[in-house]
Amino acid sequence: MKNDRPDTFIITGDIDAMWLRDSSAQVWPYLPLMKDDRDLQFLIAGLINRQTECILIDPYANAFNDGPLGSYWETDHTQHMVKELHERKWEIDSLCYPIRLAYQYWTLTKDTSIFSADWHEAMKLVVRTFKEQQRKQGIGTYSFSRDCDRPTDSQINNGWGAPVKPVGLIVSSFRPSDDATQFGFLIPSNMFAVVSLRQLSEIEHTVYNHIDFAKECIALADEVDAAIRRYGTFNHPICGRVYAFEVDGFGNVLCMDDANIPSLLSAPYLGYCSFKDAVYQNTRKLIWSDNNPYFFKGKAGEGILSLIHI
């Protein structure tokens, strides 16, 4: 308990820190069991409250400590590395997962106690951060670089990443694997943002009666969705019209997928598109073939590799 509200801190497993993404995914399979287990519901409500607190500390951070404990990543070159942060890699999905968790919790329990004034303030910060990382008004306030011998652990151009053209998509400096993006517009994470913003709009409209903010969320979701359709797809010479993994808005595309969620493969699972969607089906064929540089096939099996494991 903290301030008379449930409070739950869930470590990622091998590190005594909480990732917004990991903690959401770790409890996701248990959500249907809440109806028969009040203690479990209390635990998950506590996690949602803690995620709210984390976002209010820093919406750009991906991993948090259980208090102002500091981190071995304190030497990273970034703007706001306070003691409560374990790591400060900007990943769009870090802000989508808490919305997804809160939405599903609410859908299953009808409990609105998690939707406090702080939760609403955190969501305003989420939308503000997404808009800043559309980079329509310049490169924004976030950069990240690390002194390391692993290039994918740091961003180029003094931490700002490769240039992007502001076309309505949202920059993600890092992927869900915590590896740096090559081109800033990570399409699977932008897909996730579209779904999350629409869920957020429903909550803000139904629970808070914040009509204007709900409309703002929908408008942003529609803008990002339209940009995905226009700039996040391309004609592959073998597979036809497919979704790109990353783009920069200038016409450059990265053709691959990563074994994580969000990924291109997981788009229907996250609710972005139908499994039968023609572009998705073409993309799926590409991903499960040697046209994907991170597809493997051997005598014992086949699958999708993650860059972090190569």
Task: Go through the PLM ranges and name each one.
Residues 25-38, 97-112, 191-210, 265-276:
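Well-ordered alpha-helical scaffold segments within catalytic/enzyme domains
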